[in-house]
Amino acid sequence: MNMKLNLKIYGALHFQCLLIIILTGIMSLNSYCQNAELNGTIAGWGTASYSDKLNSMLGIRFVPALTLNFPVKNKFKLDSEISLNTWSSGTFWSGDSTTNDAKIKPYRVWLRFSGDHFEIRAGLQKINFGSAVMLRPLMWFDRVDPRDPLQITDGVYGLLGRYYFLNNANIWIWALYGNNNPKGWEAAGTWPHKPELGGRVQVPLLSGEIAATYHFRQADFRAYNINDSIYFPDPVKENRIGVDGKFDLAVGLWFEGVLIRQNGIKEGWQRYLNLGADYTFNLGKGLSLMTEFFSLSSASKAFIRDDGISFAAISVTYPFTIISSLNAILFYDWKNNDLYNFVNWSWQFDKWSFYLMGFWNPDRFQVYPGMNKTNLFAGKGIQVMAVYNY
């Protein structure tokens, strides 16, 4: 127990030291900064929902961001971003109980060196890719919820390099370190002090593009009960392969497929598939329709049939005016015969945005990772949000 505690403390201190080194490097360049820009987002919201009982929440979020640009000779560019994710909320449960939550944590802390056809970015950053929109098999390093007006998601610590060819092909290479908590669809985090490596190649094809992606890590399943089939005491080598493509034909079409192998796990093969399409109808100011089919399954072999989950998703968007639009998103769980409903009426101004949202969901929200427990967005409810961007 003491050794585990010491490892956790060491890992946390190691991580903080890494962040301090990056911040120190950025701030040491501050005297050479060509220009600095401070911007950010302030959002306040209120939610009322009913599942087994009436619950409500009030909250505020502040995401300040400092962008720095440094002069570099020739055609190169050196810039950085430092931002925080701060929030405070109070949840009021019917009865008398109240739960308060508040946190301040780094959101983005990175330094980037770039040229006309390449970029190298180091630090706490957002890395996402793929063709799908609502249910994304390639959601490996983020947890963006398409219903969230702020599109908030944690970043990952790592080094990312990208090269862009003249024909719009591009190559990505990354190395991640210190991301011990689960991310994306992961059921378990990464083993402490073990790096993650991967890359992606994307090339134009016909009227669109196609890509192949690979990632390797060593997963940590020790948090599970020792009697659980997914428990494993040692680092689990995990290899991921993904392919995706998007094409602009009479309608927009895309696909994403992922195959994951976890050595030593009983059901160590995972398969993800997404097929999607979108089209804008010439009705009024333009009615946009998007639909996706998503499936996820685990098995002891790569391509045998086994139990899993599958969802169908539909998104409809209609702009009433230049500043006002209505969006509806529906998910259908084929296995449990559950229907998830979400409606968002938004108003967009220069600096202000307002949202009126309604949802009608099962008591247990099971669409996205990290939301498998009963939460405030389960059941039926409404949410209002005001956002100020400066």
Question: What annotation goes with each model-predicted range?
Answer:
Residues C33-S51, L78-S80, A169:
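Transmembrane beta-strand segments of Gram-negative outer membrane beta-barrel proteins
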Residues L54-F62, A102-Y107, T153-Y157, H193-L197, ...:
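Residues that define the transmembrane beta-barrel architecture of outer-membrane proteins
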Residues N69-I171, L176, V203, D363:
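Outer membrane beta-barrel
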Residues W347-S353, W360, L376-Y390:
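Outer-membrane beta-barrel "beta-signal"
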